[in-house]
Amino acid sequence: KTSYGWVSSLAIDPVEKKPLYHFYPGTKALSLGTLGCNLGCQFCQNWHISRALDFDQLCEQASPERIVEAAKKTRSASVAFTYNEPIVSAEYVIDVARACREQGLKTIAVTAGYIHPSAREEFFSCMDAVNVDLKSFSKSFYKKFCFVDIEPVLETLIYLKTKTNCWLEITTLIIPGVNDS
């Protein structure tokens, strides 16, 4: 069994909850999560889906067309790939995003930005807006708490700003005493 098309979470949210405060403010986003993450953050807020292995218990199948129908039915202006890392379901996310665009829906990725350079162009070319969750500006923080290097994340931020037309906002979850200095 593959993870393609398995949706763990589906909700209608204000776009500001992504959080995007300057991209279609005041509109609704159909928020969609799958399973998995390519980071191992010790402080993960959605660990129950980022580390889940049981597709049958946590997920439902949803074709790209079904997601578009749900967004239109709920009068959502956009579909946001959120709750877990959308890059780990890139093939599915890209297919859903393309189906959304065909129907005039905007697409949003809420991501940690940890993506190989060879995959960036195809993935982000399907997105209208991106919120990158920058965990910290510290190499040691990323190694100790996320188990990855910060460099690919910083490269993704530069790529998004200089090579795409994506609206970009950055979020950092403040962990008192850990990444707040």
Q: Which residue stretches match the model-derived regions?
A:
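Generic domain-boundary/flexible-linker signal
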Residues: 43, 52-55, 90
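Glycine-rich His-Gly loop
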Residues: 34-36, 83
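N-terminal [4Fe-4S]-dependent radical SAM core
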Residues: 1-34, 47-51
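A generic secondary-structure signal marking the coil-to-beta-strand transition
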Residues: 28-30, 40, 77
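A short alpha->loop->secondary-structure connector
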Residues: 49-60, 102
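Cys/His-coordinated zinc-binding microdomains
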Residues: 38, 45
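Conserved AdoMet/S-adenosylmethionine-binding subsite of the radical SAM
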Residues: 61-181
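Short, functionally important structural connectors and interaction interfaces within domains
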Residues: 12-16, 29, 54, 80, ...
